[in-house]
Every structure is written in C-alpha cells, then in structure tokens.
Regions:
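Conserved catalytic core of the tyrosine transesterase superfamily
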Residues: 1-319
Length: 319
C-alpha cells in the first residue's frame, strides 16, 4: 500500500519516523494506518505546534465505543512509541502509559493427538469446486499454522521471495509486532514446501503471495476461517462458538505448548527454552510467552513439579 498523506503539524516528523521504522526492519503498514488516524486527530484538535499535552494524551487514549481491545492496545501503544521518538528529539510531549490487556480466564483449545490426526486427514482429503487450488494450498497452509506456530495473517502474507527453499527458511513480514522474523522448517515441512513450490511457484512472480485466491489475489482470512469450521465438522471435532473454539489461532497455542514440552522432555532447561520459544513466536519479551508456560504446566503436571520454583523466580507470583 502507498503511504497516506499527513496534514497535521506532525506530518514531517511522522514521515521521518516511518522511514526510521522501515530502516529498523519494521513493516510500515500498521504504523502508517494508526499514525494517519493520529494525524487526523491532531488536526481536529487544532494542535498547531509540535507538542502533546496530557489532555491530548488522555483524549487519544480513551477507548472508543466500538473499538476492540486489541485495536485500542495497538492505537495507544504505537502512538506512544512515536511520542517517545519525538521526546528523544527534544520536543515537549507528554508520554502516555502503556495499555495492557486485562487478565482473563479464557483458556485456548489445545488440540489432542487424536484431534490433530483427524483434522489433517480431513484437510488432506478436502475437495473444492470453487477453487481447485485450495486442495493444494490447504495442507501446506494449515500445517504452517500448527507446525510453525504462525498467525493466520502472517501466513497469508508470505510471498514467493520470502521463501528460501534451499535452506528451509521463511521470512515473515506481516507480523503482529511489525518486526520481521524468520521461521526454520523441520525436514517434513521443508519437503512439503518444496513440493508445493514445484506445483505452484512457476505460476507466480517473486513479489506475489504464495497463497492466492481463485481471482489471483491475496487470500482473505475470512475464507480460511470458514474452511476451518468445515474441517472441524468433517473431523468430528465439536465447535463451541462464542469465541470458545476450537479456533484457527488455537493451532498456534497448540504449537507453543507442544514445543515447550518437547524442549523440556529433551533436557533443555527452562531458562534456555523460554527465550527460544519467545523468539520463534515473535514475542517482544518472555512475559508474553508466560501463558504458554502456564498452559503446558497445567496439562503436564510433571513439568509443573519440575519447574514451579523456576517459574516463580522468572515471572514472580505462583502458578
């Protein structure tokens, strides 16, 4: 997408900030959308000098009526980063506090071994009259979600140029935290991607997405969610609804739990396993990985028994 035009007193600084973020390896897309909203906000408030008061900050940070929690989190915290940038340049701006998610009792669905087997049997035998390419795409796409723990948007954002077939490495650009990262494929996934490339890559250019719709466009998450529901039904895995899943995103949770368990079982210390998992998942800090450790310990009590004290030492509090 092209960069929007900024018109507030912050316009030049916003453009310089976006250039700086891109040079640092971040994706411009989500920053530019939020900063365009911020630019419009500042224009409407009549801010005519590069300053940002506490009153301005309070107005910006207020949660909107129809705003999702995740959108509110991104809107406030990304503008806070921009304000920190201005502060370092010597401008008089009020620095907002971070917005945090409220604690929740929600528990993601961790797929059992039997559910995983049934699910992928249904995926591998899926047939579509609407788009025959789906029969080729879906076994690869869904296995990336489970075997690599990628988010759906990250997966649909993979382009041909992002795939290193020789070394089995995929670069993820459209990430939640707007910072590129790499995922390393195991031998099975590497072979699967190579077979997929043999069937499809000759049809697309380097800048094209590897998962295209029948219209030749980037696939939409909504369609993949609908297929996921159909696969659950065929695999006889009950769908609870109302956000209780099993959701597409629960494949990421399942990957994280299984990966942490595998590392622990192989003798890797928790102090070593945590940063490995955190980096692979694209988390900013190991604290974002805490929920997966809790999930693993609740599902496998022997791990809790072995590491409960270390968990307390790292995160504080108790299980």
């Amino acid at each position: 997408m092209s960069r929007p035009a900024f018109h507030s007193v912050f316009a030049d600084e916003i453009n310089q900030y976006l250039d700086y973020k891109i040079a640092s390896g971040f994706s411009e897309k989500s920053f530019s959308i939020i900063l365009k909203s911020f630019d419009d906000f500042c224009s409407k408030r009549g801010i005519d000098s590069i300053s940002f008061t506490r009153s301005d900050a309070d107005a910006w940070a207020e949660k909107r009526k129809t705003e999702a929690t995740t959108s509110h989190y991104a809107r406030v915290n990304k503008v806070k980063k921009f304000l920190e940038y201005l502060n370092l340049k010597g401008y008089n701006v009020y620095l907002m506090h971070d917005v945090f998610f409220k604690a929740t009792d929600f528990q993601p669905h961790i797929y059992t071994d039997d559910e995983i087997l049934r699910y992928f049997q249904a995926v591998d035998t899926y047939h579509s009259e609407r788009n025959r390419m789906e029969e080729v795409q879906l076994p690869v796409l869904f296995r990336l979600l489970y075997c690599c723990g990628t988010r759906i948007n990250e997966t649909l954002g993979i382009k041909k140029s992002d795939v290193d077939l020789e070394n089995g490495i995929i670069k993820l650009i459209e990430t939640k935290n707007d910072c590129e990262r790499y995922i390393v494929l195991n031998d099975g996934m590497k072979h699967l991607i190579q077979r997929y490339a043999d069937k499809t890559f000759y049809l697309i250019g380097d800048s094209d997405y590897i998962f295209l719709s029948h219209a030749g466009e980037r696939r939409r998450g909504r369609r993949i969610y609908d297929i996921h529901r159909m696969i659950l039904k065929r695999a006889e895995i009950p769908f609870l609804g109302d956000g209780n899943g099993p959701r597409l995103h629960d494949w990421r949770h399942t990957f994280a739990v299984h990966s942490f368990k595998q590392m622990v079982d192989s003798g890797i210390d928790m102090y070593v396993a945590l940063p490995i998992l955190s980096t692979y998942l694209g988390h900013k800090t190991i604290y974002a990985t805490e929920r997966y450790v809790r999930l693993t310990m609740s599902l496998y009590p022997y791990i809790e028994k072995r590491f409960s004290q270390r968990f307390t030492d790292i995160f504080g509090g108790s299980l």
